Amino acid sequence: MSHVYTIGKYLGHEGSEMLIDAAVKGLSGAAKDKENGGWYSSITPDGGHVDNKLCYVHAFVILAASGAALAGHPKGEELLQDALDTYDRYFWNEEDGMACDTWNTEFTELDPYRGLNANMHTVEAFLAAADVTGDEKYRMRCGRIIKHVIGWASDNEWRIPEHYTSNWEPDLE
């Protein structure tokens, strides 16, 4: 939703800046894992958190932070840099040219599952990050993800598999 608030600001919707600020505060506060880094996948009603770190969530933090930076929020650029650094450290795999999916909370155990949903949202986030930072490596990464997806689709009668093994072999079951 944070990205939508940025769009709202540029469309002139009153109150959008207040919503951007609330999003930045949430991402810098309760949603942020100050002990292990990164962001919690979910906050429970009792104030706890779900015990994992999802690529999907971190991509959305990049998207939200990109919007906040674009909107001129005073902490937007700092949040974006933190999100990109965390993503690069834990989720982006340069060798594969794809993102991994799920870590435990401490970032010590990587789940073998690989999925396209997280990579789809990574493309969205990286395009926004490239627009805000001017760093073209994020567009290049998007191209690598897209090239993989086109290859898998062409090998599967133009149907795009969503689930993969740790070696990026389609899991069609």
Locations of regions flagged by a protein language model:
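Glycan-recognition and catalytic cores of secretory/periplasmic carbohydrate-active enzymes
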Residues: 2-173
